[in-house]
């Protein structure tokens, strides 16, 4: 099987690595990729939907996999479907479950999927008036559209809430993503991520994970795209796994089918485990980053076969098995991230980190004359697998300590 992955980050490197080790795969390509991925895939320097389609057709690619959400909300899956080519990922209509917070919240309300109470606004003054009537804080303000995982403000005061709403609706904070805002109640509890494979009917949950979005230890500092993750999430018990399947995953997939936009691909449920049970914080239409870098090292089955089955509607025939182990992924980010980031510093110690048994996935790096340099905010992911979370964490940090550049930032 020939497989093509779309994307260029750590998540895509993890997907490429796992697909390259699939017994059914003989060739792996990535568009556009990054220089750190050449150990497992051929980098293809093409741009634009038509060029991607032409390449897949020319090379007789058997399966194309989307990494980032933007290509899905823009309809890449639909273009492949029109050409009769297998594509792992939802249609543009189904990708609304991530592309529009209001779509997702309205879907959950209609089909009684547990989530926080909310209101949606496009009018700034109406939103401010609603906020001024609220007595309970914190309050969660979300940009309706895509904002690279950073479009959420947890307002501790009325002043912060008003400032967040004005910034979004005036287009200053998140551009067109903030043309509509969702204001919802703050949920207390512990977060967990449950991803699943689905062909639109059958659902196969993956091992649960927990990611950490704050830039600093102690869950402090600015929100980021994700600074680390581990799997499985300790908060998730077998009982909770079943509750999540029965009350969230299954109803969501059934709801999408009833709405005329069946979901095929990876459905990601970001959860808050509250005193009243699991509640949905958000749905994503693709693999999480950095959760993927912690989840995929635990998968024992052939990833390419699972994905292809999702495109064909035959997922129920596949056996999906997982290691009885734990994984921890730590993100190494450049100085200034997430507000800005440095670039150009040399990355040293990659081979030493790999010798510890750690996996190294590249995100924001580039290669010049055989040496790697920083070229983004989140630069590298160092992942480790071990019998316990503590052992996996210690092993991952051992790998991180062997990496050096003038200004690395990490947390786990």
Tell me what each language-model feature is.
Residues 4-5, 99-180, 234-250:
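Active-site nucleotide/adenylate-binding loops and adjacent lid/helix of ATP-dependent enzymes
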Residues 245-267, 284-355, 368:
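Active-site "cap" helix and flanking loop/linker of ATP-utilizing ligase/carboxylase catalytic domains
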Residues 1-92:
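ATP-binding N-terminal substructure of ATP-dependent carboxylate-amine bond-forming enzymes
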Residues 155-292:
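Internal nucleotide-binding/catalytic subdomain
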């Amino acid at each position: 099987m020939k497989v093509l992955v779309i994307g260029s980050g750590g998540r895509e490197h993890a997907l490429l690595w796992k697909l390259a080790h699939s017994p059914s795969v003989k060739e792996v390509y990535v568009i556009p990729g990054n220089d750190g991925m050449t150990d497992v895939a051929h980098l293809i320097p093409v741009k634009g939907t038509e060029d991607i389609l032409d390449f897949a057709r020319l090379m007789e690619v058997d399966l194309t996999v989307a990494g980032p959400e933007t290509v899905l909300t823009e309809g890449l899956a639909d273009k492949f479907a029109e050409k009769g080519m297998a594509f792992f990922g939802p249609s543009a209509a189904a990708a609304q479950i991530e592309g529009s917070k209001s779509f997702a919240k309205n879907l959950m309300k209609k089909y009684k999927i547990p989530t926080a109470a909310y209101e949606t606004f496009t009018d700034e003054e109406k939103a401010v008036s609603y906020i001024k009537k609220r007595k309970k804080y914190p309050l969660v303000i979300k940009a309706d559209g895509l904002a690279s995982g950073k479009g959420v403000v947890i307002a501790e005061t009325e002043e912060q809430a008003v400032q967040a709403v004005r910034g979004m609706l005036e287009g200053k904070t998140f551009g067109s993503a903030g043309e509509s805002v969702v204001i919802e109640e703050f949920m207390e509890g512990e977060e967990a991520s449950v991803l699943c494979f689905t062909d639109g009917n059958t659902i196969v949950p993956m091992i649960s994970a927990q990611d950490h979005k704050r830039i600093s230890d102690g869950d402090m500092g600015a929100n980021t795209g994700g600074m680390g993750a581990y799997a499985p999430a300790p908060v998730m018990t077998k009982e909770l796994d079943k509750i999540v399947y029965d009350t969230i995953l299954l109803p969501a997939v059934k709801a999408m089918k009833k709405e005329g936009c069946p979901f095929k691909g990876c459905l990601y449920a970001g959860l808050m485990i509250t005193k009243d049970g699991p509640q949905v914080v958000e749905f994503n239409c693709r693999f999480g980053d950095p959760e993927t870098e912690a989840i995929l090292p635990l998968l024992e089955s052939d990833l390419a076969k699972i994905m292809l089955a999702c495109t064909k509607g035959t997922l129920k025939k596949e056996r999906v098995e997982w290691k009885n182990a734990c994984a921890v992924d730590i993100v190494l980010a450049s100085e200034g991230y997430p507000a800005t980031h440095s670039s150009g510093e040399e990355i040293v110690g990659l081979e030493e980190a790999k010798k510890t048994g750690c996996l190294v996935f590249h995100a924001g790096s580039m290669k010049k004359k055989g040496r790697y340099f920083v070229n983004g905010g989140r630069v590298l992911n160092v992942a480790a697998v071990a019998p316990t979370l503590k052992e996996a964490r210690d092993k991952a940090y051992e790998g991180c300590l062997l990496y050096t550049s003038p200004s690395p930032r990490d947390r786990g």
